[in-house]
Amino acid sequence: MADIIKTATRDAYGKALIELGHKDKNVIVMDSDLAEATRTGKFKKEFPDRFFDSGIAECDMMCIAAGLAATGHTVFASSFAMFAAGRAFEQIRNSIAYPNLNVKIGATHAGISVGEDGASHQCCEDIALMRSIPNMVILNPADDVEARLCVLAAVEHDGPVYMRFGRLAVPRVFDDNYNFEIGKGNVLVDGTDVTIIATGLMVNEALIAAENLKADGISARVVNMATIKPIDSDIIVDSVKKTGAVVTAEEHNIIGGLGSAVTEVVCEKCPAPVLRVGVEDVFGRSGPAVELLHIYGLDAAHIEAKAKEAIKLK
């Protein structure tokens, strides 16, 4: 059996920035005194004239990024998700999204899996915040392959993009032939009894859950939803028609994230049971990332339980 490849999506982000730097001299990268952690430090070493560090001033960084974008540059502004989406929300809304500027926000260390840094750094509200902003695209890749493709797709998109990356090394889901398109989900496993729609590191957990459910005689469809906004309504509706029940899985508060986005589509277009796996509207705590994911129910076992419950509601 081949060894499982595990890579943090933040590492893929850093490598993709260097790739873009060689291709496009118009690309500028910014950070807020976290270059080593966000992996933008690699870009800094390669292209020092196109890297700017704002210091611990995320709000200023977003405004400077907006100014650079207004002059025709494509700017990647990087920080931890807590400080990018949380602290700099107003600047993202008014200076970047309102004028629809080409600023791509690289938000690393998202979710519970930040681990020992604790509740102050475990941002489980960022997707909800960014979903509420007009013009904003939200990407949450499942692995390093998809993370790279998200960055490459973001630079081609005209307007702001919020990209969510993790600290924890996660198993590779996709091979090098995988094609990513903004606004499109993709079916990883087909099934007839229940649909599991997952995003980020929960995609791998969804695949494990589907295998375990299969052993119990349950056929689960698994959909990877890397684009949270604009959500792929077509694949959601198609999945509901085929299975009649949905479970969403995300490393985010169940309020305002993937679960809410999917529920909105289902409620409006094809009513069916939808159950959500995610952070149950609570704050995090300090601890090893893998242990915290289990404590907060962000694992295959909880997806399986919700899937069985959803089937009973049909």
Give residue ranges: language-model regions:
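Thiamine diphosphate
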Residues: 1-164, 169, 302, ...
